[in-house]
Curated annotation (Swiss-Prot):
This is Aspartyl/glutamyl-tRNA(Asn/Gln) amidotransferase subunit C. Its EC number is 6.3.5.-. Heterotrimer of A, B and C subunits. Keywords: ATP-binding, Ligase, Nucleotide-binding, Protein biosynthesis. It comes from Cytophaga hutchinsonii (strain ATCC 33406 / DSM 1761 / CIP 103989 / NBRC 15051 / NCIMB 9469 / D465). It comes from the Bacteria.
Length: 95
């Protein structure tokens, strides 16, 4: 499949793109190369190929999520350079 410059100009207009004549010619060449590559993909026989949901059959193996206390709130606040009651104090970073 190949499109002429006039058709590509109409498509560009619908997409609200503006090209000068030289750029439109270059874009037309590139666009037609992409379309010819897609035509080659359409020639591939995929009769016995199942559609893919994922690119890989690999699964994520995750550990079981177990709730446990590793450090208490008070211990965490002991290491804080600044604190306010039960909260960490941090420098303001919004301008």
């Amino acid at each position: 499949m190949s499109l002429d410059t006039k058709t590509i100009g109409k498509i560009a207009h619908l997409a609200r793109l503006e090209f000068d004549d030289k750029s439109l010619e270059a874009f037309s060449t590139d666009f037609n190369k992409i379309l010819s590559w897609i035509d080659k993909l359409n020639e591939v026989n995929t009769d016995n190929v199942e559609p893919l949901i994922h690119m890989s059959h690999e699964l994520n193996v995750l550990r079981e999520d177990i709730d446990k206390v590793t450090i208490s709130h008070e211990e965490a606040l002991k290491n804080a350079p600044k604190k306010d009651s039960d909260y960490f104090r941090v420098p303001k970073f919004l301008s």
